[in-house]
């Protein structure tokens, strides 16, 4: 096929499309270009096929490609979201996912190790738990989960992002992926519920407590600024009883039972000022900002006072500001 001469056909039909294809030069993509990951893999396969000596070698390359990456959008994409098409749940690939790795997140080594240990057990087929990453905003919870997907994508890990209003579709989503030859993280960002919201009951039933056994290729990873996910009010304590010195409240237990369904909970707390300065200095060194440590500390301190306080996100925004001035 690669040696076939299309010129006689083009002359007969008065076309030149095959000549254009044969001389096509792909446009270079910057690092964060949409879907670069997919096009790189297809391009690599094309180059291997071009060098094949015979049909058997051609067949081996193609079958190995599908063995490594699977077929369809699950094969070539890392992350997905769901949509409702006239009552039918459909997956949509997220083509512009941030290409962040765990080493890009400065600090939080204990937290990252707990997340890595659980995820490695999952992709290797060992027992693992649903994870809740909770703590102050801007501390790297969402970044850690995105990085985990990037780190373990080549081992068959995929991510499906689901929003709170879509929890009613969770059972359908699980039914669609439970027999796939991939490991799926169902990702819920900024998970929390007001006292009047009942969507958490869908989530509780899916995580544990339903009749059907949870598939071994699915875990739920969630982030939240709240430790207990569901907002409590003093009314929740209205049914508190005293029984042999123990306080009990059915309403409180009902709400707290959701967080208990996450076997691994990881606290991402706000950094101290020293840790904040360390993050800012490390990011400056990585990205080539030419300031002394003392200058970075002074500027970072002024920045956080007027931009929402100390956090890893504040440090990153400060670095972006410095890079924009260069």
Where on the chain are the PLM-derived regions?
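Interdomain "pre-motor" coupling segment immediately N-terminal to P-loop NTPase/helicase cores
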Residues: 26-91
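N-terminal pre-Walker A segment at the start of P-loop NTPase domains
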Residues: 94-120
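Conserved P-loop NTPase mechanochemical-coupling segment
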Residues: 99-103, 142-165, 193, 231-232
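Walker A/P-loop
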Residues: 130-160, 172-179
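Conserved nucleotide-sensing/catalytic segment adjacent to the nucleotide-binding pocket
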Residues: 157-162, 171-215
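Conserved catalytic/switch belt of AAA+ P-loop NTPases
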Residues: 194-244, 250
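Conserved AAA+ ATPase "SRH/arginine-finger" region at the nucleotide-binding site
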Residues: 241-256, 263-277
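C-terminal alpha-helical "lid" subdomain
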Residues: 265, 269-326
């Amino acid at each position: 096929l690669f040696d076939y001469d299309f010129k006689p056909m083009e002359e007969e039909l008065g076309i030149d499309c095959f000549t254009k294809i044969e001389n096509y030069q792909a446009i270079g993509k910057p690092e964060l270009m949409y879907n670069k990951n997919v096009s790189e893999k297809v391009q690599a396969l094309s180059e291997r096929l071009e060098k094949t000596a015979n049909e058997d070698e051609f067949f081996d390359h193609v079958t190995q490609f599908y063995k490594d990456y699977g077929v369809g959008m699950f094969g070539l994409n890392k992350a997905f979201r769901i949509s409702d098409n006239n009552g039918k749940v459909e997956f949509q690939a997220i083509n512009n996912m941030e290409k962040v790795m765990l080493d890009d997140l400065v600090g939080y080594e204990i937290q990252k190790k707990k997340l890595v240990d659980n995820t490695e057990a999952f992709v290797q087929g060992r027992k693992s738990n649903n994870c809740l990453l909770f703590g102050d905003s801007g501390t790297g919870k969402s970044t850690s989960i995105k990085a985990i997907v990037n780190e373990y994508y080549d081992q068959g890990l995929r991510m499906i992002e689901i929003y709170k209003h879509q929890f009613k579709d969770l059972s359908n989503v699980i039914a669609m992926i439970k027999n796939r030859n991939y490991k799926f993280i169902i990702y819920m960002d900024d998970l929390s519920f007001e006292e009047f919201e009942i969507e958490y009951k869908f989530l509780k039933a899916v995580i544990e407590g339903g009749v059907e056994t949870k598939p071994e290729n699915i875990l739920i990873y969630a982030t939240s600024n709240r430790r207990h996910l569901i907002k409590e009010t003093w009314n929740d304590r209205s049914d508190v009883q005293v029984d042999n010195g123990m306080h009990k409240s059915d309403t409180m237990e009902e709400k707290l039972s959701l967080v208990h369904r996450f076997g691994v909970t990881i606290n991402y707390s706000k950094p101290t000022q020293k840790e904040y300065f360390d993050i800012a200095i490390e990011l400056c060194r990585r990205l080539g900002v030419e300031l002394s440590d003392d200058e970075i500390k002074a500027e970072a301190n002024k920045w956080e006072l007027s931009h929402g306080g100390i956090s890893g996100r504040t440090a990153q925004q400060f670095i972006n500001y410095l890079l924009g001035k260069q």
